[in-house]
UniProtKB/Swiss-Prot annotation:
Quaternary structure note: Occurs in many kinds of cells as a complex with monomeric actin in a 1:1 ratio.
Superkingdom of source: Eukaryota
Role description: Binds to actin and affects the structure of the cytoskeleton. At high concentrations, profilin prevents the polymerization of actin, whereas it enhances it at low concentrations.
Name assigned to this protein: Profilin-2
Organism, as annotated: Corylus avellana
Cellular component terms per the entry's GO annotation: cell cortex; cytoskeleton
PTM per Swiss-Prot/TrEMBL: Phosphorylated by MAP kinases.
InterPro entries: PFN, PFN_euk, PFN_sf, Profilin_CS
Residues annotated as signal peptide: none
């Protein structure tokens, strides 16, 4: 399966059978190279990936400044140290799951809930990790 198929079929999927889906998603290498993304995923800046990777290594690094992605600032909320970063902005937010080689991004807006975004992103992230990726 291509990386784009993982994004299209596992991240941009119908979450609840009602046609709801994430606003944007991507699979990105630890070096910031985009493996696949939805058409709506923002353009990443190298320093944003550097900051995200540092927060996985040093949990709490992004808390004072916020998480920036494509120039959008998210307030960092409770995640899982070294494994998941979660952010909030207004009625939407972001979940980032780290695997051995990749970062799985999901961005949501209402009516999708934080829990639904977490489930979609972390399920694919866990699967990729189990595959050694």
């Amino acid at each position: 399966m291509s990386w784009q198929a993982y994004v299209d079929e596992h991240l941009m999927c119908d979450i609840d059978g009602q046609g709801q889906q994430l606003a944007a998603s991507a699979i990105v290498g630890h070096d910031g190279s985009v493996w696949a993304q939805s058409s709506s995923f923002p353009q990443l800046k190298p320093e944003e990936i550097t900051g995200i990777m540092k927060d996985f290594d040093e949990p709490g690094h992004l808390a004072p400044t916020g998480l920036h992605l494509g120039g959008t600032k998210y307030m960092v909320i409770q995640g899982e140290a070294g494994a998941v970063i979660r952010g909030k902005k207004g009625s939407g937010g972001i979940t980032i799951k780290k695997t051995g080689q990749a970062l799985v991004f999901g961005i949501y807006e209402e009516p999708v809930t934080p829990g639904q975004c977490n489930m979609v992103v972390e399920r694919l992230g866990d699967y990729l990790a189990e595959q050694g990726l």
